[in-house]
A protein has these predicted regions:
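N-terminal leader segment of winged-helix/HTH proteins
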Residues: 1-28
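A positively charged, amphipathic N-terminal helix/segment that binds anionic biomolecules
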Residues: 3, 67, 89
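Canonical helix-turn-helix DNA-binding module
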Residues: 48-84
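Amphipathic alpha-helical dimerization/coiled-coil segments
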Residues: 100-133
Length: 133
């Protein structure tokens, strides 16, 4: 087994590791980010729609997670109203590439977590069957 040395494993200063699991979890693995990704796949795209999700994301956390997803090109924002300026958040190709992962998380939750909301999961799978998978 090869030993990773400091010279051979220069880490981008933005990330704390060269491990793809660690870095993916740093980007997506908190309590709220995957809920936002789910909502985007379900067709929600505005700040107020994200706030209306049943999980009740606090506004400061919502703003922070949207910024992180924007900064990492997982989503883009487009103005849909000029006065006052309002934005729609849209998955990029990079964001849409998460679809099979989200699908597997949904399926795993349905199988292994009692009381999982079948209706929401089925809505997700149905909405994303055509375009994302």
């Amino acid at each position: 087994m090869s030993k990773i040395t400091e010279k051979s494993s220069k880490v981008n200063s933005e990330w704390r590791s060269i491990c793809p699991i660690t870095n993916t979890l740093d980007l997506l693995g908190d309590k709220w980010t995957l809920v936002l990704i789910r909502d985007l796949f379900l067709g929600k795209c505005t700040y107020s729609e994200f706030q209306a999700s049943p999980e009740g994301i606090p506004t400061n956390i919502l703003a922070s997670r949207l910024k992180r997803l924007l900064d990492n090109n997982v989503i883009v924002k487009e103005a849909y109203q000029e006065r006052p300026v309002r934005y729609a958040y849209i998955l990029t190709a990079k964001g849409k590439a998460l679809a099979p992962i989200i699908k597997e998380i949904v399926n795993w939750g349905l199988k292994h977590i009692p009381g999982t909301d079948d209706k929401l999961a089925k809505e997700y799978l149905k909405k994303n069957k055509r375009s994302a998978f």
